[in-house]
From Swiss-Prot:
InterPro entries: Ribosomal_uS10, Ribosomal_uS10_CS, Ribosomal_uS10_dom, Ribosomal_uS10_dom_sf
Species in which this protein is naturally found: Leptospira biflexa serovar Patoc (strain Patoc 1 / ATCC 23582 / Paris)
Function field: Involved in the binding of tRNA to the ribosomes.
Signal peptide bounds: none
Stated name of the protein: Small ribosomal subunit protein uS10
Record-level Gene Ontology MF annotations: structural constituent of ribosome; tRNA binding
Protein origin, superkingdom: Bacteria
Gene: rpsJ
Coiled coil spans: none
UniProt family annotation: Belongs to the universal ribosomal protein uS10 family.
Keyword Zinc: no
Length: 102
């Protein structure tokens, strides 16, 4: 396992949660002796939904809602067994999606 690269992708709707999670992952990886590249902010996906305010008339009256998905990328280099074990035991907030590839 020594010398491999782990790529961690994070997704969340709240930018504060994702920043806190990236800080915890980077600190854990550095504490175990791995080299960390990142966090790299990826483009934010913005989905906009437009709906009518009234159920029957007033076509001009509309309301818009948006959903932003924030993404971050972290590359962890020169990993060892301690790094992988520490990352698996890490408790992250519920609103953060983590995708780990080696």
């Amino acid at each position: 396992m020594a010398g491999q690269r782990i790529r961690v992708k994070l997704k969340a709707f709240d930018h504060r949660l994702i920043d806190q999670s990236t800080f915890e992952i980077v600190a854990t990886a550095k504490r175990t002796g791995a080299t960390v590249s990142g966090p790299i902010p990826l483009p934010t996906k913005k989905e906009i939904y437009t709906v009518l305010r009234s159920p029957h008339v007033n076509k001009k009256a509309r309301e818009q809602f948006e959903m932003r998905t924030h993404k971050r990328l972290i590359d962890i280099l020169n990993t060892n067994e301690d790094t992988v074990e520490a990352l698996m035991k890490l408790q992250l907030p519920a609103g953060v999606s983590v995708d780990i590839k080696s």
